[in-house]
């Protein structure tokens, strides 16, 4: 059968490395390493899963060339000493046996390091933090610069000894080489600062030293921020200029974008379209006639194919997409595109947990980042009936997982459609990518002959009893939180009123005009939902006021979303009222108490109550009572246990495997 995506599966040779297809797993931190910087066996398995899934080239996440000074994480990989070679050798062996090539990214964090982790003041080109509010680094002396150059070369040689097929030098994303390249962070007046040629000198010396150490046949990749997307930073045109000073020994450019201060363009926000950066790779490729990797929210294989066919890039880089589905390449190659579990770019598990919380990565759509779909190999050892109440993402995950291991499974959903809150929120234009997850889950459910779905059906005790359950999963979701505030319950979500929850707003979404200049919007609640409402109306030109009881709007958001929403609030002039509490609701104004204890009125054309969600358990207590004298276990998962994020519900849905094991079905 002829493959629909011939360009994706065309091999390519770079020096002596031949890659079997054009899909590259781009480097992305995991926090899976050991605290001493060694590669853990969990870590090795993580990369092997992606190699088994068909990925052509895996570029391992950034490894420190000079620890502790150059480290940017408590579990970051190290390649600065020979004692790290054995585990890295094992990694290369594990990836190679599946036909994939493997490279490793070499890096020095510079000012992106933290003194609390490295035990010393971070260093950089100048005494400029790598992001607003960051630590002030110490400018490097010339002899220190040359020492670091040598460390890059030594690290590259180790990579070669380990069995890596190539190395990538990280020259973007606010790490040390980027700090020299960027006029934002490089204020030097010596031969390493000022002109583009001088700012590129450090990168040039590093690349030349790496080439000297690895010889003429070993591929060198360089990752760049082609456009820093910050005021005063390098534009694409600036980058095209400075690349001339070190492109000679570079075999492949990995063309990214953004700095720490524009992280929403570095780790793409979810509203950015598939392949939005590909024009940057095309510009680099056309000027320097070098193979280029393009990255940027690429989830759809047709987009990837079109980029390659159009000559915009030579490789398609995927980081989060392969966290979400290690089998992405195999599914595309063998015609199972509908089975792809697409990343929704929520940045919660991969960026939020890793960067914000310094924890190992997780994934909203993939509850088993390391083990993939291996659980399906084991089937229940005796008949088991599982009844799942609620067809949102948590309920769907539980139902599908139970059916996939052989349970006879019944899914009961009150509404006409499956997908729950994720499907609803995806109707907000900037959140449409979110629909990929419930759509995938619905498709997955449709393929399971032992999963029976009842829609437009309210679960009752009698109905559940009739299905003879061995295990019951309650996944009935959540509803908006509406506290007992004067006027609120009389007005919110009522016909003819101007006060609504986000659910009612979405129901009316097509009624709001595209041009809302001069109209006033007031939002009570500065969490994720309130910010979604803010984005919708500011983009239509409305004047928006946000009210939050806490000292900060966006508390608890992942760093990518937080940076993005802060930028949007500044761009659109959103009025932020923090430490402010709602006292009364009227049809054209909110009455609030400000931090000084004074009463204020906030007039609006439309007012929105976005105070989060609360668990909704309409039948749980009845089920508990009805099955109290039986061996039937009832588990409550997702938002119906406690309103949180999709990621927790997905994990709890997959945990049906633990429930089955507890009852000796597995």
Tell me the role of every PLM-derived stretch.
Residues 267-273, 376-378, 383-384, 424-436, ...:
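Short, contiguous acidic/charged loop-to-helix segments that flank catalytic cores in large enzymes
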Residues 1-389, 393, 397-404, 408-409, ...:
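Flavin-dependent oxidoreductase catalytic cores
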Residues 388-456, 481, 526-560, 564, ...:
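Beta1-alpha1 glycine-rich phosphate/pyrophosphate-binding loop at the start
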Residues 366-379, 447, 453, 481-540, ...:
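Glycine-rich dinucleotide-binding loop and its adjacent helix/turn
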Residues 435-481, 490, 495-519, 539-625:
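A Rossmann-like FAD-binding core segment of flavoenzymes
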Residues 533, 557-558, 627, 637-666:
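A conserved FAD-binding loop/helix module that cradles the flavin
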Residues 303, 459-463, 645:
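Short acidic active-site motifs
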Residues 37, 71, 305-306, 329-330, ...:
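Short amphipathic alpha-helical segments
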